[in-house]
């Protein structure tokens, strides 16, 4: 499958669906990859079935992409730039965007940094992230510290360690490298792109998702009923709401 270079880091991607279909970038969550997040959950099938051209990215540190052992390689602006580099590599001016969890945080950064490259964006499993302390705990657990008792850290460790493709040190660097101040009200208030925020109503990681949607002008909030952070992804309601939002373009 194809790779491309983004700032000296080799990244893996997948394309699916009709070549002339409206393109959409899919960006997965932390400790996941394109195949796990979007193929096994039948998102690729749903989107290509709706006539869309899917551009699936394995983020740096994940999947089949290169895995730097340096937190500075995982700044959110850098990872948002990777999505732009994919568009450049494919000679596309614009695309829709669908990101989940980490992929949604990357997408929000892209929405404020380079909105001209997107048509509309769906941000799933994202809330009001103020997680510097939690990120440190997750990194410690990924590095083998069994003294960490934080439930989220343990969840991510178990999820990551179960997959041989994962490099736990790269993932620790990734979670540490993404820590930065929240986007301020002025930057969120300047967003003009159509945005939808979608999250499971039982998702503790995406707490504050409705508030985030309220802070973005014109943004839509969709609650995925009865779902948590992990099982919201394959939910039919999530797919239906996303396809409806994309069809409004």
Question: Where are the language model's segments positioned?
Answer:
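N-terminal cap/lid segment of alpha/beta-hydrolase-fold proteins
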Residues: 1-11
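Active-site loop/oxyanion-hole signature of alpha/beta-hydrolase fold enzymes
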Residues: 39, 45-49, 56-96
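Catalytic histidine-centered segment of alpha/beta-hydrolase-like enzymes
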Residues: 227-239
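Active-site nucleophile elbow and catalytic-triad environment of alpha/beta-hydrolase enzymes
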Residues: 172-187, 202-204
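Conserved hydrolase catalytic core segment
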Residues: 93-131
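Short beta-strand/loop motif that positions the catalytic acidic residue
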Residues: 191, 197-199
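Conserved HGGG/HGGXW glycine-rich cap/lid loop of the alpha/beta-hydrolase fold
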Residues: 9-66
């Amino acid at each position: 499958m194809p790779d491309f270079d983004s700032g000296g880091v080799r990244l893996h991607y997948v394309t699916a669906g009709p070549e002339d279909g409206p393109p959409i970038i899919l960006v997965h969550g932390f400790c996941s990859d394109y195949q796990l997040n979007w193929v096994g959950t039948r998102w690729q099938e749903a989107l290509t079935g709706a006539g869309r051209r899917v551009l699936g990215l394995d983020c740096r540190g994940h999947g089949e992409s290169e895995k730097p052992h340096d937190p500075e390689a995982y700044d959110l602006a850098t990872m948002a730039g990777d999505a732009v580099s994919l568009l450049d590599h494919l000679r596309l001016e614009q695309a829709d965007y669908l990101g989940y969890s980490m992929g949604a945080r990357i997408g929000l950064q892209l929405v404020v940094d380079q909105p001209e490259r997107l048509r509309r964006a769906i941000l799933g499993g994202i809330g009001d992230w103020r997680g510097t302390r939690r990120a440190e705990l997750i990194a410690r657990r990924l590095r083998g510290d069994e003294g960490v008792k934080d439930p989220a850290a343990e969840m991510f460790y178990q999820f990551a360690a179960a997959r041989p493709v994962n490099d736990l040190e790269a993932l620790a660097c990734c979670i540490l490298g993404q820590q930065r101040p929240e986007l301020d009200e002025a930057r969120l208030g300047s967003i003009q792109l159509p945005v939808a925020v979608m999250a499971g109503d039982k998702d503790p990681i995406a707490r504050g998702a409705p508030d985030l949607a309220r802070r973005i002008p014109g943004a839509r909030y969709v609650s995925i009923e009865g779902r948590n952070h992990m099982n919201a992804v394959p939910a039919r309601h999530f797919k239906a709401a996303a396809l409806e939002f994309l069809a409004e373009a």
